[in-house]
A protein has these predicted regions:
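Short amphipathic alpha-helix that is part of the acyltransferase structural core
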Residues: 2-41
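Short, low-complexity Ser/Thr-rich regulatory SLiMs
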Residues: 18, 71-73, 86
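Acyl-donor-binding surface of acyltransferase catalytic domains
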Residues: 1-8, 98-104
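A generic structural signal for beta-strand entry/edge sites
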Residues: 52, 74-76
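A short helix-loop-beta-strand connector motif used in the catalytic cores of GNAT acetyltransferases and
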Residues: 44-56, 65
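Conserved acetyl-CoA-binding loop-helix of GNAT-fold acetyltransferases
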Residues: 81-86, 90-104
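Conserved beta-strand in the GNAT
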Residues: 56, 62-70, 78-83
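Alpha-helical elements of Rossmann-like donor-binding domains used by nucleotide-donor carbohydrate transfer enzymes
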Residues: 24-28, 62, 96, 100
């Protein structure tokens, strides 16, 4: 799933997370909440979760968003841990992540 950012003329893409996304994702997650974030504690579990998918959104190749999809049953899914880098907000990053998750 992609979304064109007309102002910056850059494409937002959503894909499955990779281990090498960890550092960049945790960096923007640390800037998301004033009191810290739990993503650093669940990253490895979510990355290996066979009952769902960990998605990363990128802008100009740089991770700027995160969402975890967990399949609760064949008909029901749960989306959790949605995060968007504060510097990339208001560009449709979460929309791209949710749309990609809905197609899985």
């Amino acid at each position: 799933m992609t979304n064109r950012d007309a102002a910056a003329d850059e494409t937002i893409e959503a894909r499955l997370a990779r281990e090498d996304d960890r550092e960049a994702v945790l960096a923007f997650c640390a800037r998301t909440w004033d009191d810290g974030d739990y993503i650093q504690y669940v990253w490895e579990d979510w990355l290996r979760d066979s009952s769902g998918a960990l998605l990363v959104a990128t802008l100009a190749g740089r991770p700027v968003g995160l969402a975890h999809l967990r399949m609760m049953s064949p008909e029901e899914a749960w989306i959790e841990g949605v995060r968007v880098d504060p510097e990339a907000r208001r560009r449709g990053v979460a929309r791209v992540l949710i749309s990609r998750a809905a197609r899985l």
